[in-house]
Amino acid sequence: MTSKFFFISNKVKKFSKTFEVDGDKSISIRWLLLTSQAIGISRAKNLLRSEDVLSAIECLKKLGVKIRLSKTECIVFGRGINGFKFKKNLVLNAGNSGTVGRLILPLLIKSPYKIKIIGDKSLSKR
């Protein structure tokens, strides 16, 4: 079986859109992970502040993503696809978030270094 790779070579035009969603843990985590892969600044108002969402933020910060969190807004300075910057033998703590553990893995696939994802006792049993 042959594998074919393709790359998107056309630049996407800069755009500015506002989306309103309910404060949902799953959506908040996915938004953080997606915007970490964008180039530029992404903002979310009233992002959910659950333990799982905060675990996602800490994991992304360890991967070199700059994130500013205030009482009303979260700002992510995206690094682009495969733009993470980190040291060898990195350990990411997903806490109790299976969503963070599962969804961050594909973003790390191109890393030349070993990255260990850990969690609390509950997550480690899953």
Task: Indicate residue ranges for each PLM-predicted region.
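Short, structured segments at the rim of ligand-binding sites
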Residues: M1-R126
